[in-house]
Regions:
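Acidic, PIN/NYN-like endoribonuclease modules and their adjacent C-terminal/linker elements
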Residues: 100, 104-129
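Residue-level signal for well-ordered alpha-helical positions
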Residues: 17-18, 41-45, 81, 88, ...
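Active-site neighborhoods of divalent-metal-dependent phosphate/nucleic-acid chemistry enzymes
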Residues: 65-111
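Histidine- and aromatic-rich ligand-binding microenvironments
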Residues: 7, 31, 91-93, 114
Length: 129
């Protein structure tokens, strides 16, 4: 099995106590985009308790693995994925496209609880939790 790139939704689900449906693989990675989304969640928390929960999630993610960066390979993968979605007459979801592009460029599967990644299934293996 290839490495699993965990989408932001996996960490939000764990934070909220939602089941993932299966155990996570031993080899996991995260995108720097997921780190940014989780940091935004901390900054936008409506109250101190929510902020504390979100900060704990962010710290857990940072301890899990170094975030995969957005580099030239990821940029090329992003352009390919976004052009495919646009050619089909749909508007790509920017953050999800970056996460899928990170997976594509790094030979990883996207593990997610979101249905938003179906646009990329022809190019990137998607594991829906």
């Amino acid at each position: 099995m290839s490495r699993a790139l965990l989408d932001t939704s996996v960490f939000v689900a764990r934070e909220q106590g939602r089941p993932l449906g299966r155990p996570l693989p031993d080899e996991v990675a995260v995108s720097v985009v997921t780190v940014a989304e989780l940091e935004l969640g901390v900054l936008m928390a409506a109250d101190p308790l929510t902020r504390a929960h979100r900060l704990r999630t962010l710290m857990d993610v940072k301890a899990l693995a170094a975030a995969l960066p957005l580099d030239e390979r990821v940029a090329s993968a992003y352009a390919l994925l976004a052009s495919t979605v646009l050619s089909a007459g749909r508007k790509p979801r920017v953050q999800d496209t970056w996460i899928a592009a990170t997976a594509l460029a790094n030979g990883a599967e996207v593990w997610t609880q979101d249905a938003d990644f179906t646009d990329f299934a022809a190019s990137v293996p998607i594991v829906r939790l």
